[in-house]
Amino acid sequence: MQLRTEHIYREFLRLTRRLSNSQIMMLLAVVVGILAGLGTYLFEILLHGIKSGLIRWFPVDSAHVLFLIYPAIGIILATLFVKYIVRDNISEGVTRVLYAMSSRNSRIPGHNCWTSIVGGATTIGFGGSVGPEAPIVLTGAAIGSNVGRLARLNYKHTTLLLCCGAGAALAAIFKAPITGVVFVLEILMLDITAGSVIPLLIASITATTMAFMLRGFDPILAVTLQPQDAFELWQIPLFILLGVCCGLMSWYFTSTNLRVGNFFRKIDSQYKKWLVGGAVLGILIFIFPPLYGEGYEGFMSLMHGRAQELFDNSLFYRFREIDWVVILFVIATMFFKVIAMASTNAAGGVGGTFAPSLFVGAFTGASIALLCNAFFDWDVSVVSFTLVGMAGVMSGVMKAPLTSIFLIAELSNGYGLFIPLMITACISFAVDYYLDPDSIYTCLLYTSDRCRRLV
């Protein structure tokens, strides 16, 4: 391995002898973007292969008993993979990236270039109610960190490549390059200079281009706003109300996640954690099938105005046309999603909080719209409130209003909702910040055993 590294380094020096440092960083940003795009593609292929093979044959008009079993299998497989093959903690991907930047000279173990893909896809494919973004971000960051290590870059440039990898991976999964850049600047807090932003832009654009080449041009959460979904001035009070509700849901999201994590930490046996987590998750998914996996199908149904699809594979399928049942189902699913997510991670699954925050936000926005339409006979767009709610809860949970605004703007193929996005995201951020000034990532950083030993 040492000889191989020396050979790579000599070839790198020979090829870049006539290039300046900034040119070298731009070249390496392209390399990181390509690798991050490929890693994201492999993750999605593995995830959708597992998920499709397990549940595509389920009848839509009834619940299936395998919903009780699949999540526990996924968690135990991920736990065994981590314990006996990886032998390192690969959960809480974004938190680990922040920790590596602050305390490990931006060094991330090489195995994270692939282990997060396997662990995350296994957990989510079998029904773990977590998001793929954290494993993907950790994978991209690991690629950037290890490219920097192989090139023998200093701490500053290695950190820049780490951030390029993280942003590129996020840009690739959503096909949203601006979101990848803003995510790094806002959450990873990379210094804003021309020397740092340009490689970051290059990596994000390269990874997004790879995603277009491998998966087509449609975003993972593609939605096109119709004329009836357009923002109107009379809706401003409703978006203010939505911002307050999203702020409260953000606080519920973070506090419940921490409480569930503390509960599982008191369980002394990993076997018992798996048993409890698998049982809780299986029961919740059996009753509320939209909780299965990352939940993209759930809020895609809401974004396309087809709330009845949430009842597919459900015990309540025959009630899907009753308005008040739909509203209660959406609200209950919204609250139980947080418990399902926290139980998955705490029991040993590998996944993140990014997609769950979008899920909870989508269901929060849809709940407000459905309630307004049902009780006041208003013609409120469920689609626009679903999208804006996603930005609201994400803004509060991650303390990242800009990332949430640009993500939803890119996903909706335009900026027609920019004003309500700004209103709701900022109010949600303010409400949640008043209740808890820390983001979910810094909260997890504070509560990790490793960080407590550093204090």
Regions found by a protein language model. Give the residues of each.
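Alpha-helical transmembrane segments and immediately membrane-proximal extracytoplasmic
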Residues: 1-448, 455
